[in-house]
Amino acid sequence: MKIAVIGAGVTGLAAAARIASQGHEVTIFEKNTNVGGRMNQLKKDGFTFDMGPTIVMMPDVYKDVFTMCGKNYEDYIELRQLRYIYDVYFDRDDRITVPTDLAELQHMLESIEPGSTHGFMSFLTDVYKKYEIARRYFLERTYRKPSDFYNMTSLVQGAKLKTLNHADQLIEHYIDNEKIQKLLAFQTLYIGIDPKRGPSLYSIIPMIEMMFGVHFIKGGMYGMAQGLAQLNKDLGVNIELNAEIEQIIIDPKFKRADAIKVNGDIRKFDKILCTADFPSVAESLMPDFAPIKKYPPHKIADLDYSCSAFLMYIGIDIDVTDQVRLHNVIFSDDFRGNIEEIFEGRLSYDPSIYVYVPAVADKSLAPEGKTGIYVLMPTPELKTGSGIDWSDEALTQQIKEIIYRKLATIEVFEDIKSHIVSETIFTPNDFEQTYHAKFGSAFGLMPTLAQSNYYRPQNVSRDYKDLYFAGASTHPGAGVPIVLTSAKITVDEMVKDIEQGV
C-alpha cells in the first residue's frame, strides 16, 4: 500500500520506518529543510547545538524502533549511560550532584536532610507501580471506541493511579524537604506541565531517570534524528523536504482520507498518518466540510497548552568542559513563584533555567578550545502569555541579561559575556512559526486529566477512514520516549487495519 506520513520529526520518522518494514511504500512530507522536527540542530560558527530535547531517558524505547525494523540499533546510534544525571544549583554556594548509583544517591539525600532517603525511596516505589499500571493499561494502547476505555479493567487500574491527585501532592506526601521537592517537581517542566495541575503520574520522570538511567547519544540528540533518517533510507522510504502540506483531502462520499495537497499538487495515498502538531492540523489542514468533529477550528484555542520556552545557543571562546556537568539546573530563589509565573502568563525576572553543555560528552560538538552552551528558560505559551511581545528586541535583550546573570551562579560562567563568540535565540514565536506549534507550545497539549488517555486526541481518526494521528498532542503525550510510543501504537493499528482490509 501507498502510505503518506506528514512530518519528519522523531514521531514521523519512527512511524514511517515501522510501516516500511512491513513492506509498504512510504513517503514522508516535511515542510522544513531538514528532518527532526523539534529534535532539531543548529550549526553555527563551528558549534553544533541540539535545539530541542537533550536528555535521553528510557533508551530501550529508542532501540526498539531499530530492532523492530530488523536492524541493529548500534549501526545507527551510539548510546552511553551517564554516571551523574545533573548538577543542581540552589545558589552559587549550594550545589548538589544527582547520581544514578544507589549508594551515592543515598549519600546525596542524607547530606540534604538526614533520614530523607526513606521518603524518597517510597516515592520512587509508588511512582514505579503507577508507571507499570499506566504503561500496561493506558499508555501502550489506543482508544478506538468508548468501551476501550469505559470498562471494568480501566476503572480498577485507573483508580490505582489516583489521577485526581496532582504531581505536587504526591511529591509532598512523601517528601518534606523543600530542596528535594524542587528536584522532583522541576522535572514535570520537561514535558511542559504545571506540577499543580498535572496528574500525579507525571511525577514519573525522576523515577525513570533513577530506574532506567540517563544516556547520551554521540553527536547529541540530533544523532537520533539522523539515525532514524538513515533507517528510513535503508528501508526505501522517500523523504520529501520543503514539502508543506496545504490540506488533507477527504472523500465526502466515503468519508475517507485519500490524498494530500502539497506544494499545490494533489497526491493520492491509501492511508495517511499525520504527525504534525495536532491542534494546527485540526485548525488548518482539514477541509471546511470535513472538520475533526471533536476539535473543530473554533474550539482549538480553548484547549489547554503546555508551556513554551526561551532558548539560547551560546558559543564561548574557552573550554570549560572539565568544570561543568553535561546537564545542569539553576533554581529560581522563588521556585513556586516562578512556576506560577510560567502558567499564569507572566515573565520571570528570576527564572529557573536548564543548562546543557554537550561538549562535556562529545568534544566534536564545539571547536577545539571552545564550548557550546544550550540554555532553556520555561515561559508562558502565547495564549496565556499574550501580553509578552517576543518580537520586541528590547524585551529579548532584557531576557538575555536575566539569563546571563543566572548563568553566573555557576562559577565558571561568572564572566561569560566577555567570552561569547556566538549567540542565537529561539522564542515562543519561533516554536509557532518553525514547527506550527499552536501558541508556541513546546510540548503540545497539556496532559491535564481532561486531555489525557481517552480524552486526548486519538491515534485513529473517529471521523474519517484511513486517517491516523501521532505525536506530542495526541495519545499518549509528549516527551521523546512517549512520542516514539505514539508512533508504535499508531502504526500497530494501521497495520491491523490493512491486514483486516479496513
Swiss-Prot record:
One of its GO terms (biological process) is carotenoid biosynthetic process. The keyword Flavoprotein applies. Its EC number is 1.3.8.-. Pathway: Carotenoid biosynthesis; staphyloxanthin biosynthesis; staphyloxanthin from farnesyl diphosphate: step 2/5. FAD binds at V5, I6, G7, A8, G9, V10, T11, G12, L13, A14, A15, A16, A17. PANTHER family: PHYTOENE DESATURASE (PTHR43734:SF1). Belongs to the carotenoid/retinoid oxidoreductase family. CrtN subfamily. This is 4,4'-diapophytoene desaturase (4,4'-diaponeurosporene-forming). It comes from Staphylococcus aureus (strain bovine RF122 / ET3-1). The gene is crtN.
